[in-house]
Every structure is written in C-alpha cells, then in structure tokens.
Amino acid sequence: MCLTAAPSRVSPVAAAAAAAADVAGSSESTVNLMADVDKKDPQYKQIFLERFRKKLQSDKTGMNDLESFVELPEGVAPSAASIGPIKRGSEPLPPWLKLKVPKGMTHRPRFNRIRRSMREKNLSTVCEEAKCPNIGECWGGSDDEGTATATIMVMGSHCTRGCRFCSVLTSRRPPPLDPEEPEKVAAAVHEMGVDYIVMTMVDRDDLPDGGASHVCRCIHTIKEKNPALMLEALVGDFHGDLKLVEQLAVTPLSVYAHNIECVERITPRVRDRRASYKQSLQTLEHVTKSTNGKMLTKSSIMLGLGEEEKEVRQTLRDLRTAGVSAVTLGQYLQPSRTRLKVSRYAHPKEFEMWEKEAMDMGFLYCASGPMVRSSYRAGEYYIKSILKQRQSAEGGKATAAATAANAGAAIA
C-alpha cells in the first residue's frame, strides 16, 4: 500500500455529506429538512445531501452548487458529487513519488512528543501547514535514535502573501503577534530534545518591519534556553529592506535560509508580486557580505513549474555568485486544486544531475531529489558537520591567539 504526496482522493459524496452534516448540526432549519426521515435509514446521508443541495440553490446565499460549499477532490468534476463514478482528470503520480505508509508512525515516542508539544503551546509547523510529504520521516526520525527535525513556523498561521504554489493560509490582516511566542517556541524546542531545529515564518507585510524584530527575539530566546542547539532560520525578504535582513544575520543563527523558489522567468507567475528573483538574490548576497562570509546561507529551487534546463543551471550560478553555501532541489507537487498545476515530473536521474552540477559549482552542500524540501532532514547531517568544522576552526584560531598573547606577556 502506498501513500502519495498528492491530495487524498475520498468519496465526494462522503466528503460533501460530512460537511453538510456539520452545518446541519448548527442549523435548526436545516435539521428540519430531515424531519420525515428515520436516521437509521441506510439512505439517510444521500437523502440529506440531495435536500441540502436544493436548499442551497433555493436560498439567496450565492452558493448554487456543492462545489461552492465543499472542496472536491482533485480531478473530480462538480457533477461527480452526486452518485456515480468518479472521473479522474489529473495525471497519476510516477512510481518514485509514491511513499510507503510508515508502520506505527503515530506510536513513535519522538513523533508524538513533537506533535504534542506543538499542540499544547498552540504553535504552527510548516510541516503541517504546507502539507509536507516528509513529516513522518522528519518528526519520527529514521528510527527513534536518529535525528528528528521539525520546522516551527512563527508569527501565526496566516501569511500576507499569496504565492501560487503554497498551501499556507493567506490574509491581508492576520491576527496580532503573540508576545509570548518566543518563550513558547524556546520551551517547545527544549522539550523536543533535538540538536538541530529549523524556524520559518509567514510573511507579515502588515507590520512595519515585516516581523523582523519578533523573529530576532525568537532566535535569541531559543538560543538562551538551548545554547548548544544548531538553529536554522528560513525567512522572508522583509520588503527588501537590507537593514532588517542584516538585523537577523547578526543573531546567533547557524544557517540563514531564504528560498528563491524557482527560475527567474516564471517568478511573476509562481510567487507573490511583492517577491522577486533579484530581491531574493540581494537578500542572500547581503547576508554573506554583512557577516564576512561567516554565516552559512541556504536556498531552495522547485522543479516542475515550467522551467527549462538552462534556466535551472543559471539559477544555481546566480545563487553561488550571491555566496549561497547550500542548496536544495525538489519536485513541486500541487497542494490543492486552487494552486498551480504541475507542468512535469522530473525523473530522479535529473535530480542526481543537478546535485553533481551544484557541487561542481562550489556549493558546500546540495540535497536534490523528488521528495526533497528546503528543510528536509537528510541535509542537516552534512550541514551539522560543516558547522562543527567551522566552530572547531574558530575555536582553534581563538586558542592560537590566546596562546600567542600569553607567550608575548611572558616574554615582556
């Protein structure tokens, strides 16, 4: 049995009936629709569904069909919500994009510990909000002794931007920031017991600084409570304000990540109009310059959005020129029927080719594969080794400097 990364295909009748039943439970007038039908009747749900449809059509609600009320499965026509065969209009996923259902995943202590910690503190994870197909592997680890990674999303679950590839909820006026969030996130990270964490954010263009000061507080609070933790921040462009970018770059981060997402030509079609290819490159380049190359920078590219091979190659070159140290490439998968459709499914061999080319260009690290995402756990193993090597090198320089100073003092 396999679990695909595409939206699950459930019976449209069952989905619509379940949604309609929710409304029925809170509306006396709707409940009266079924006053003459015994609830034990095997056709109860279907009768209710048909009557509810007619009520929507007769009421002046602006919803003249169940498609306005219920999001039908991908590839299912609105007419298929009535009894009849489901017509599948979408192309089936290739074999390499089908995942085996992890056995006993919800019984793994680490998986449950992360999920429980997030729920108790009312925190969001991009793993869930963006419907990442790797959530079981990342949260549970390859085994309970392996590395577990969760990507915590700060500043709420609503983004002010509307990129056409992303499933995160959007809003022009999201709820105000939670002033206690830095403490909650730091406590959650401590409870997870991990040594590497990724923190990402929703864009908050409604805030004067885009939320930069709030993110900085989160970073400092996390590191204060977890000094040995390696912290990666996957952040936005902060309106292109390089002073705000630098404000984050000088925090005690281990990795500064900002995704360019796709090749330049299709950026206006894929990303929100407030984001741009050049702005993302400027953001990454400024992080490198403002930290004298000491900050490890990272970015990500999606394939399957209509890009050409030469454009992917140029994007890799542009990232490397901007000083980016690590890059990931993965297959774009349509998260819902309202998002951009997949133009093609890149073969695993193509991802292998891009990994080799990226390393030949001078990237310190590249994770490239159909199921790879910007925060994919496989990358952290190697990135951790790079960070430890850098820390050792810095420690060695400090020791050498101290030794030289002591020797000079002794001679004097």
From Swiss-Prot:
Pathway: Protein modification; protein lipoylation via endogenous pathway; protein N(6)-(lipoyl)lysine from octanoyl-[acyl-carrier-protein]: step 2/2
InterPro entries registered for this protein in UniProt: Aldolase_TIM, Elp3/MiaA/NifB-like_rSAM, LIAS_N, Lipoyl_synth, rSAM
Signal peptide span: none
Binding annotation for [4Fe-4S] cluster 2: C159, C163, C166
E.C. number: 2.8.1.8
Enzyme class, first EC level, given as a word: transferase
Residue numbers binding [4Fe-4S] cluster 1: C127, C132, C138, S375
Keywords: 4Fe-4S, Iron, Iron-sulfur, Metal-binding, Mitochondrion, S-adenosyl-L-methionine, Transferase
Cofactor: binding comment: Binds 2 [4Fe-4S] clusters per subunit. One cluster is coordinated with 3 cysteines and an exchangeable S-adenosyl-L-methionine.
Essential cofactor(s): [4Fe-4S] cluster
MF terms (GO), sorted A to Z: 4 iron, 4 sulfur cluster binding; lipoate synthase activity; metal ion binding
Classification via Pfam families: LIAS_N, Radical_SAM
Residue ranges of every copy of the Radical SAM core domain listed in the record: 142-364
A Gene Ontology cellular-component term: mitochondrion
Keyword Protein biosynthesis: no
Catalysed reactions listed for this entry: [[Fe-S] cluster scaffold protein carrying a second [4Fe-4S](2+) cluster] + N(6)-octanoyl-L-lysyl-[protein] + 2 oxidized [2Fe-2S]-[ferredoxin] + 2 S-adenosyl-L-methionine + 4 H(+) = [[Fe-S] cluster scaffold protein] + N(6)-[(R)-dihydrolipoyl]-L-lysyl-[protein] + 4 Fe(3+) + 2 hydrogen sulfide + 2 5'-deoxyadenosine + 2 L-methionine + 2 reduced [2Fe-2S]-[ferredoxin]
Location in or out of the cell: Mitochondrion
The keyword Transferase is annotated on this UniProt entry: yes
PROSITE patterns: RADICAL_SAM
Domain of life: Eukaryota
Family: Belongs to the radical SAM superfamily. Lipoyl synthase family.
Remaining remarks: This protein may be expected to contain an N-terminal transit peptide but none has been predicted.
HAMAP family, A to Z: Lipoyl_synth
PANTHER family: LIPOYL SYNTHASE, LIPOYL SYNTHASE, MITOCHONDRIAL
UniProt protein name: Lipoyl synthase, mitochondrial
Originating species: Leishmania infantum
